[in-house]
C-alpha cells in the first residue's frame, strides 16, 4: 500500500489571507510560530494581521536558532507551547523549516510553512536535513510533508539576494539528478510521476533565473521572482516527495553526494547549500559524460555568478581524495542509483568539471 500526499500551497502577496481558512480545515485554534530571527520579522506582520479577529491563538513566537541541529530540534520538541499547539507555523529558509519539520515528528503536529527565502524546496518536502553542531552533515529525517505552504513573492524578493541565487543553484540539480537516478527505467507509477514532474524543473530556471535575480537585488516582487519561487518550492518539492519513498530513493545523486562531502572539508569561507550543489551538478554531468549539458549548465552558472570551479567554493584538486572518502557516508552514495558509484569515476568527474570550469573562466 502507498499513500501519497502533497502540500497545498497559496501564492501571492496576499497569501496570508488564506491562513484562517487553512487552519480551520484542521480544526486548529492554537498555533506556535517558529523561525529565524529575520524570517519572523518579515512574516509575522502579515500572519498576525491575517489572524486578527479570529479564534486562533498564537501560543508562542520562537526563534529556532541558526541551524537544523539536534539541539535546536529538541528546543522545539520541549517547548510547552509547541506541545500544546494544533499547528506549527515554520517561517524561514531550509534550516528553520527542517528544524520544525523534524521536531513535528516527535510532537505529532501538523506543519504549515512560510518560506521567506527560496533557497531550496524544504517548504514542500517530506524530508529534512539534520546537521551536527560543527556544521557537518548528520543525515536526513523523514517527516510528514507540510500541510500548507504560503509563498509571498514580496517577502522573498525583499530577502537577501544570495538566498534566491543559491536557491536557483540548488534547483538546478533536481531534474538532472532524478533523470540520472531513474535512468535504468522500470519505474512504478509514483516514481514515474516524479520523473515526469522532474522534467519541468530546469527550464523555468533558465527562462527566469537571471531576471529574477536582478529583480531580487532591487527588492522588486515580479513575475520572474514568483515563477522561480514556484519552481524551487513547488516543482522541486513535489518531485522530492514522489522520488523519495520507503522502497526507493531517486531524489538526489552525484551533485548532492558532492555537496554533502564538502561539508566535512575544513576550509575558509562560508558557502551556501545551493551554491555548492550547483557545482555538484557540473560534477554529475562530467560523471555521466554528458558534455552538452555540462556546457549548458556551466554557462548558466557563469551567467548567474554560481561556481564553476573548486576554488570558488574554497576547495582545490588536492581535496578530491578526501571528498571521495567523505562521499561514502552520504545517502546518495549508499543508495547508488542507477548503479553503485565508484571513487575513480567520482574523482575523475570532479577534476573534469573543475578543468572545464577553469577553461570557461579563462
List the predicted regions and their residue ranges:
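C-terminal charged capping/lid subdomain of soluble metabolic enzymes
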Residues: 2, 18, 290-362
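ATP/NTP phosphate-donor binding region
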Residues: 1-84, 310
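Active-site segments that bind and position negatively charged phosphate/pyrophosphate groups
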Residues: 188-299
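A short, small-residue-rich loop immediately preceding and capping a beta-strand
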Residues: 80-103, 107-118
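A glycine/threonine-rich phosphate-anchoring loop and its flanking beta-alpha core
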Residues: 105-198
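Generic secondary-structure signature for well-ordered alpha-helical cores
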Residues: 24, 52-56, 135, 154-156, ...
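Short glycine/serine/threonine-rich phosphate/pyrophosphate-binding segments
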Residues: 16, 40-44, 70, 95-102, ...
